Curated annotation (Swiss-Prot):
GO biological process: 5-phosphoribose 1-diphosphate biosynthetic process; organic phosphonate metabolic process
NCBIfam families per UniProt: phosphon_PhnN (TIGR02322), PRK10078.1 (NF007485)
Protein species of origin: Klebsiella pneumoniae subsp. pneumoniae (strain ATCC 700721 / MGH 78578)
Its biological purpose: Catalyzes the phosphorylation of ribose 1,5-bisphosphate to 5-phospho-D-ribosyl alpha-1-diphosphate (PRPP).
Lineage, top ranks: Bacteria, Pseudomonadati, Pseudomonadota, Gammaproteobacteria, Enterobacterales
Enzyme nomenclature, EC number: 2.7.4.23
Sequence similarity: Belongs to the ribose 1,5-bisphosphokinase family.
Binding site for ATP: 10-17
UniProt-recorded name of the protein: Ribose 1,5-bisphosphate phosphokinase PhnN
GO molecular function annotations of the record: ATP binding; ribose 1,5-bisphosphate phosphokinase activity
Keywords tagged on the record: ATP-binding, Nucleotide-binding, Transferase
Length: 187
């Protein structure tokens, strides 16, 4: 049976990178975290990603080495086609996805896709954006506005206002609940 592709999305500052790093440390033999291939330096930001030049990115895209790819914020992002092998082998795969490209992921993966949307209250999101120090006050206001306006449909919601441990536990609880609902539908 194929695994599930967990498409983790949320506004900038919602804690996706921290959650993914914590999931990598958690003992769970059937869960793999996909790296993103990104056209930005390896040491830019906190995401554990594979840095590519635009030339490298386009070469890989032409060779169909990305299962999914998109362009946002003057940067190219890709999820390697290796996730298809992992899913076929029965592993669940978590990918740092894009809210704006959720429809693309749904189109390609259908019922295998399990979107999880990180939800963070505006005060917590503001605090996180200010603490990381990458954006000025205007950019933070724009990010907060965008976060309030864009809420994907048909997404499991994970509140990420609390501790990282709470979020990891809630992540696995959501997956178990989703699996139980799917099993009930088969009966």
């Amino acid at each position: 049976m194929p695994g599930k592709l967990i498409w983790l999305v949320g506004p900038s500052g919602s804690g996706k990178d921290s959650l993914l790093a914590a999931l990598r440390q958690r003992e769970h033999p059937q869960l793999l975290v996909a790296h993103r291939y990104i056209t930005r330096p390896f040491n830019a930001g906190s995401e554990n990603h594979i840095a590519l030049s635009e030339h490298e990115f386009f070469t890989r895209a032409e060779q169909h080495l990305f299962a999914l790819s998109w362009h946002a914020n003057n940067t190219y992002y890709g999820i390697g086609v290796e996730i298809d092998l992992w899913l076929h082998a029965g592993f669940d795969v978590v990918a740092n996805g894009s809210r704006a490209h959720l429809a693309l992921a749904r189109e390609r993966y259908g019922e295998v896709l399990v979107p999880i949307c990180l939800a963070v209250s505006p005060p917590v999101l503001r605090q996180r954006l200010e603490q990381r120090g990458r954006e000025n006050a205007l950019e933070i206001a724009q990010r907060l506005d965008r976060a309030a306006r864009y809420k994907p449909d048909n997404c499991l919601t994970l509140n990420n206002d609390g501790s990282l441990r709470q979020s990891v536990d809630e992540f696995f609880r959501l997956l178990r609940s989703h699996a139980a609902r799917e099993a009930d539908q088969l009966v």
